[in-house]
Swiss-Prot record:
Belongs to the UbiC family. Pathway: Cofactor biosynthesis; ubiquinone biosynthesis. It catalyses: chorismate = 4-hydroxybenzoate + pyruvate. This is Chorismate pyruvate-lyase. GO terms for molecular function: chorismate lyase activity.
Length: 169
């Protein structure tokens, strides 16, 4: 049985292109980071660690707006974690992977445990990103990206917690 999602069910306000223009440049550089967020965090601390919250297969996706970002699958791999810089929680991460993506080498995604997702994804030459949506939830910045790994999709939502360097100007 799964716990309630680490990312609350509070409404997310996704920013329009016009609203993006109002975001501070430093904040926007974090939200639109194209490389590994893990590597970016490592520039601001001595050690980045993962605290797993929950992981396993699910048969349906909530909230529904995530479902619209992925093709239908009978099951999805769900992984929710807290990413810490020097043992301080900086980011909540939620990864959804259609079962069809978990083939060949990419089956390793179900065994990451305390390894940051970025360490796996950004070593792959077959990785591309379809989009980055940015928004706010309960006063926290967040972003959602759909990646293609060997032309197979996965969805990553990241919520930046108050102690995160994204809020430092």
């Amino acid at each position: 049985m799964f716990k309630k999602s680490i990312i609350t069910h509070a409404p997310i306000h996704w920013l329009s292109d016009e609203e993006r223009e109002e975001v501070a440049e430093n904040t926007l550089s974090w939200l639109l980071e194209l490389g590994s967020m893990t590597r970016r965090f490592e520039q601001h601390c001595h050690q980045v660690t993962v605290m797993p919250y929950q992981e396993g297969f699910i048969e349906y996706i909530e909230p529904a707006d995530e479902q619209k970002c992925l093709p239908y699958s009978r099951r999805y791999w769900l992984r929710e974690i807290v990413l810490c810089g020097d043992n301080v929680p900086w980011l909540l991460g939620r990864t959804l992977v259609p079962e069809e993506t978990l083939t060949g080498e990419d089956r390793q995604l179900v065994n990451l445990r305390t390894v940051p997702l970025g360490r796996y994804l950004f070593q792959e030459t077959t990785l591309s990103r379809d989009f980055i949506h940015i928004g706010q939830q309960n006063g926290h910045w967040l972003r959602r990206s759909r990646f293609q790994l060997s032309d197979k999709p996965l969805l990553l939502t990241e919520v930046f917690l108050p102690a995160s360097p994204v809020y430092k100007q």
